[in-house]
Every structure is written in structure tokens, then in C-alpha cells.
């Protein structure tokens, strides 16, 4: 892919710079230890890795004295090879850096090492301590070398392969297994391809085999299904060899074998499980760690689980033997030990006949872990429902509530509403730990719990756990501030992120009271801190970098705080090391940094790269280019204008690809044309092909941007398996890439109808690429695998064909029994069942209107929140579901808060008249509606007016949390009423209002209100502009023209999009050029059409990352001094052979003179 740069010129340069060593020692060969003589010969041959290994070996048994360095140099001098200590050090550094970028050559080097050198290399990998070699003149940090090697793309692969090839012949097998574990645990799992098992040793000592099996168990989830099967075969091949089984009727599977297999026991066949001796299975169950093993069989199938349960029941353990179960104590949970031993097998327990209520409760308690299963959740829910019925026999729900575990999430609204406040209060220690609550259930249970409490205090709120989101905004506002403060410092604070924006603002309004702001703000921790308004921050004098370390900052907060603290601190580096504060570093701050300071603290930016905006990255790139382009991390070149990519010589393609592959190109380069240029450079480096798996390792995230042509024809068979493993994780392949992947898969595996279960599992993320006809066979053969694949696509909306295949699969496997008492017009219609709806998730969008209309009322009640979360429902489907809600709950005027909250998107089907009927007196109800973003202006106005009418508030009465809760419906406000909003409430929620995409007229009125808070637009700072968000789109033409061009990058992209076309075109060319890459990418096509040629040129400059600040663009010289040249930088980095892209040098060396 690229040629290794020669080091002759480097050596010559260092030689001339430092001077040739003049040390001479008589009889140097006889006077030098044989290991050091060998090291010197390796240096002469250019085998620096071998030389380093000789040095490490020597140091392990000898003390390095002051004269040894000079003796080594004298020896080299006697061989007519002249080095100084600095030049030798640089040569070794350069060589090792090259090997990090050329891991195939590292593999070759390690193959050529002698036995002693190889053992030394392996021992270095084994060490955990941060050891080093102190050679008096030089300190070599071996710990850093090891860490960098294990983290470098491709190096891990070479270390893995060489360990398999040579280690087991030269070192103790336990040590080799430990090395394999280190290397594999730092990998993506792609090393473990099915054919790798052919290289695994089959004659391991028992302890080494068990340890290596443990490594494979730890990596199970990173391993493909085919590789899991291959590793299982390797493990069982060794286990069967050691088995005492004499014929086919006897099982080779012993208790210890099951323990060794661990998660791999799910690959045992049904027949093998049924042959396991009852004695062995009973012995296995009695092991102390058997439960841990069975708790992790996440991908076990019901059939295999039933087989294991049958063998366990045939052993001396008996689920019904309550005297055995009772053996530890007499309390309810003392019945737990045996069910606990079953691990995830309990999720498939089916011997329910004559089961008593106590054991049913124990089983329910153990079934909490069933959420970890891969699939089969509908069956789990069904089993929980059956156990729930048994657990409540001869008892009321009030009596059993605390002993039903997480099965309580299956209770209907009517069951929850029937609970007494006392029962909920008594069961709170169970209810507060349950996950999976629907929001409507939380509302009901919280109301019951709080009804038992006379005063809302820290103590009773701290008991609520997962039910905290059910506390109303008004209730939070009624609490004392000291109680709120304690809540935010307690364990229950982890649930604050589950609260609605209105609830969070209600809490914030208590913490930040006008008369005493400072203590409240400082006490707010974590992500909640970013909700603090810029206005309140400006009133707080007591911030420092230490106080801010545990707080998440919004960008407007960071901009303000960094500028504030920079004026008062004597150690600006503390601000950069504070993490979140880097969001507030502006281009002017970067420009003002001295060269030494910038280079010394660039690592702080790199450590927090995900927090930086594209504009900040652009500024960092320009700064680095100006002060130290020879050591510039190559990925930063992508932030500069596209022509700068020509600065990457062919010899530096590998570090360029590694550096760029560790970042996400979509967030680094926003302009499609520029991205094309970057990818053209990538293709040039690759020579339009991927030759082997090492190239895949080096590419990292760039794999997701491979052109379709390379995917189709440029990936070699050797590299394809590794590439496919990486492509699985690509979030958004384009249509051409998807088509190319599909063709490759068809070429390799054939049509889906011929696929095995393992193939289907491995290709799960790619099933969406196939047609409905192609998927039909998968839906028939492997319906559960198809469902699992669909569940993992929750972040994206799959194709209609894929969803239809999922739908058909579920419908074909469900009971097709029409209702005994159907609704009128529903005779012969198989209505949706709760199980079907639970399984289908987004594929529920495939229901016909007739199916939804014929849904039974109980089914609707149990699944309404699932249906309300489906993004793909059409307007007619939503209308049908709304009618179903009216049929079940009566007219909207009778609906309570939990009804409205549960509707989700179904509420969008309510017309204006129906919305006016709703009880909208609670801001929490309104907040649940405003969460939807598809309201028509008329609907939004009905919700807003409904809240004002039902609550009795007027516009001037609205508090900050009311404004936040109104959300998008606030855009429906009459502009004549905006001036009535109290400034004291508006100023603390500016950032929230600035997220709304309101009309230009509404934004303009909000902008006028913002002027009261922040002054005239000519006085606005970067932090104010960032805080305002879309409100800034309300600026007039004159105000926009008056803005300093240096403020342009601090508009939010959403504000740029909201600027009317006729106003946007009033920006000067200089202002447009200063927008920055992110804001330039937000410019709409309609806005672009109104621009002049000069403005369009400026826009392209902004998109490309051209310099608009401080220095002039496009310096041509590669030297570190500034230049005013504006020529093309092509070839500017041809002397970039010394680039060391890692934050720390591979060989950490420190000269001590």
C-alpha cells in the first residue's frame, strides 16, 4: 500500500546535528558482553527490534553502568558505523514506529527472532507493571511500548498470529494463553475467524486449556456464530478425548465439561443434552459458580432450555421438594436457592401444574434476569403472566404486590388503580427497582405512593427509584430546596435523566432561586447541570475548574465559563484538562496559545475530541499546520481545505489512514464535495483495493465509507471476512454500498433459502438489504433470528419489505383463531394479539386497518404504549387506533393523564375538537403531548389554549417549567402575547425555547424579548448567540449585517436553517465565509439560491474549512515558521517521514544530560 521510507537521510541529519561519537575503547569486542555484542550487530544490520530485545534481556540480569553506552558506541565505531546516543535513539524510535504502521513486517521480524529474543518479547507482553529500562543516558518506557502495541491496528493481529505459531513451542502454555487473552481482549473479535481453530493447539495442559476456554467465553459476544461453532468444536474435541464414555449411549458430557463450556453449552445438540447423566447434571448444578454460568446463556433456545430442565429434574434436585428449598431459612426469599441455581433456564420453566403460590413468587423473583435473553421475550412475558396468576391465588393484589418482582409491569391500568396507597407504600422497595415500566404505569403508582405521604420530603422521594418520573412537576416545585438538593446528591439522582424537561425545570427552579443562586448551582452535578441557564451562570461568581469537573456543560455555558475562568486562572492548562470546558475554547483562544503550550496540551483536545465542534477542529488543524506540521496528526488534514490532502506523501498513507480511521468522518467532514475529496485520497492510498485483513484493521471507521466499486471488486477474499465483520457496525451505508454488499453476500453464501442458522445470525444486520421474496425463506426457517435482527435495528427505520417479512413471520407462527365474540364486522378476522404486538415492534406498522379495528379491548389496553411508539404508522392507522381508544376509554373528555400519556403518536390523530375535550390542567400531560413534533398549527393552538383554559393560567402567570412543558405548542402562541411572558421566567429557559422551530414572526418576537435579557444584538457574545438557538433567526436584516463576522460560527445550525431566505442573503461575503463548516453545511437549498456568486464562493470556503482568522490561507512551506505565501500546499509535507502520530512516542525516551 505504501513504501517504507528510507532512514538514510534521517541518520545523516542526526549524525551531522549531534556529531559522531569519538569514544574508543581498546579491544571493544572482547570487552563487551556477548548479549551487547549481539545487540550491536543487530543495530548494524538495521534489526532494531532484535537489538531492543537483546538489550532487555541483558538488563534483566545485569546492572547498566555509566560506561556501557560508550562501549556500545565504540564497538559500533570499530565496525565503521557511527552513532551518537541521540541518533541511535531516534533510529530505534523511527524503526518501531514503522513497525506499528506495517504490522506484517513486525510479524516477519518476530518470526526471525531467535529463541531467546522471542521469549523476551513474549515476557514483555506478559508484564502488567509500568516497567522501564534505565540506561543512565536513556530511559525506555517498556510499559508504554506494550500499551501502544496492543492498541495499534494490525499489531494485535500480528501478535496473535505469532503467539499461535511459536509461543507454545517455546514458553509455558499457561503464559502463552495469558498472552493470547491480552491480545484478544483488546481486539474486535474479528481475529477469531472459523479457520483459526485449525491453528489452536490440541495438546494443551488441562489448566492452560481451561484458561484459554475462559478467554473464548469472555469474547463470546464479539465472536461470529460460525466462529462460535468452530471454537465449540475445538473445545469439545479436547473434552471428548478426555472423556471416559465408552459407547454412543453414554454421554461424554460431565459436570466439569459443562463448567468448562460455560456459554458454549448452548451449542450442545438436543440429543447430547438428553444423554447427560442425571448424576453429572446434578453435580454441575451444585457447583458454586454454576449459576453464574447459566446466568450467561443469553442465546439459549426454548428447546435446549427444556432439555436441560428435564435432565435437572431427573437428578436428585426436585423443584417441588420444598423441604429442600426451605433448608436455609423460613423467609420467602429463603425459598430462592434452587430456582436461583437455574440461571436463565428459569425463563423457560414450564412445570406449572400444582405449583403453589410461594414457589411461583420465587420463580418470578428469579425471572428478573430474563430480560437479558436474546429473543423469546414474548414467551417470557406469557410465563410471567401465568406465574402471576398462580402467585396471587387466594390472595389479593394488595397482599402480594411486593412479592411479584418485575412481573408487576404486566398489570393493567385497572389493576394498578385498584391498589391501595398502603400496599404501594409497603411494596416500594420492590417497585422502585423494577425496569420496564410504562410511563402511564409510573404515573399511577407514583400517585398511589405519594397519596400515602402527607408531605413530599427527601426521604419519601429517595425511596421511589424508577418511579421518580411519576412525580408531577408541581409536586417537585412544592418541595423544600434542601430536600431537592439532597435528592440530587442521593442514589435516586440517577433517575433524573428519565424526567421530562418540564420536571427537570421544576427541580431547577427550586435549586436556582432568585434570592440565593450560588449554592444551588454549584450543587447540581452531572448532565443535569447543562440545564442551568446562561443568565443564572452569569450571576454565579464561585466557579473554578475543579468545581466543574463533574458537570456536563452545554456549549453556551462552556463558552462563557472558559472565557470567565481564563481571566482569573494562573494555570490555563487546568481549564483544558477539566474536560467539558474544551467546548468553550474559541479560535481566538487557540490562536493566542504559544507554540509550546499548544503542543504540550494538544492531548487534552484529543482526549475530548468528541466534545469539539467541527469549527473547533478546523481551528486546531490550522494552528497545528502553522506551528508544527511535521508532527501534525494526519486526521486533522481532513479539516483543512481539500487541496491540503495532497500534502500526505505515499510513504505516510498508513498513519493517515489509521489516524482518520479512528475518527468518524461524517462528523469531521460535513460537506459532501469535500468528503469526496477525502475519500479519493483514501482510495489513492489503498490503490483502490484492500489486499488483506491488515488493511481492514488499519482503515477502522473508514471502512464504512468505502465506495461501492471497492466493496464489489476491490476487497480480496482474504480480507472479506474481516471487512464484513467491520461493515456490520456501519450506521448508515448508502444505497450503492448496500447493493454492493448484497451482491457480495449472494456470491459468497448463495440465496437466503440455502443459509444455515449460523449464517443467518452472522448476517443479521444485512438482512434488511434483501427483498421480501428472499427473506420469506428466512422468516419460515428462522423466525426468531429474524426477530432478533429486527430488534437490533431499533435506532433506524427498516425497509417496508423487511418489516413485512418480520410481520409475516410472526403472523405465520401465531395462533390464527378468530375471536369467539367478535365486534360487528370482524367475523373471520384474526385480530392482533398482545404477543404479536410485543414481538413485532416497528413491524406493527404492517397491520391492516381492519386488523387494528378488530383488536380486542384488553389487547389494546395492554399494548397501547407499544403501539404509540411505532414510527411507521400512517395517518389512517393512527385514526383507527384513536377510534379504538375512544371505544375502550370513552370520549376524550373522560380520559385521565395516564390515558393521554400512553397514546404516544396515536394522539396525533386527535382533531382540534377532541383535543379541546382533553383535561389539560396538568403541565405534565401537556408535556407528554408536546413531545410529539408532528402537530398541525391548529392542533398545537388547541393544546396551548386548552392548557391555559383548564389550568386557569394566563400567559403572564406562566412559570419557567410551564414554558418548557408547552414545548413545540408554544410556537402557536399569538405574537401579541409574547411580551406578556415574565422576563424572570423567560430568561432561565431561553435555551429550551431556542430549540423550537417556530415561525419567523414568533422567533422575531422572542428575539425582542431576548434583547431585554442580553442587551442589543450588537452586544451579544458567542455564548449568548449559542444560548439563543433558533431565537437568533429572529434578527432583522440590519441587525444581522451588524454582527461581527467572528460571531458567525456561534449561531446554532438550527438557527441558520430558520433564517428566512430574504434575510440570509443580506449577510456579507465575509460573514458567510466565517460561518464555519457546521453552519455552512446547514444552509438550505432555498437560501443558497438567493446568494450572489461572491457569496456562494464564500460559502464554499466555509464548507471547505478555509482560514478566515488570524493567519493567511494555504502556506506552501513545510517549515515551522510562518509564511504569507498563498500557493497550493501540494507536496508541502514530502519530508514528513518522521511523523509520530501517537500522543506519546512509541519508544518513550528521555535524555538525561
Curated annotation (Swiss-Prot):
Q: What InterPro entries does this protein's entry cite?
A: Stereocilin-rel
- Main subcellular localization, coarse class? membrane
Q: Where in the cell is it found?
A: Apical cell membrane; Secreted, Extracellular space, Extracellular matrix
List the GO terms this entry assigns under cellular component, sorted alphabetically: apical plasma membrane; cell surface; extracellular region; plasma membrane; side of membrane
Q: Which domain of life is it from?
A: Eukaryota
Q: Is Ribonucleoprotein one of the keywords UniProt gives this record?
A: no
Q: Which residues form the propeptide?
A: 1131-1153
Keywords in alphabetical order: Cell membrane, Deafness, Extracellular matrix, Glycoprotein, GPI-anchor, Hearing, Lipoprotein, Membrane, Non-syndromic deafness, Secreted, Signal
Q: Which cysteines are joined by disulfide bonds?
A: none
Q: Which residues are glycosylated?
A: 156, 211, 244, 289, 321, 394, 398, 460, 544, 812, 911, 974
Associated disorder is: Deafness, autosomal recessive, 22: A form of non-syndromic sensorineural hearing loss. Sensorineural deafness results from damage to the neural receptors of the inner ear, the nerve pathways to the brain, or the area of the brain that receives sound information.
Family of the protein in this entry: Belongs to the stereocilin family.
State what protein this is by name. Answer: Otoancorin
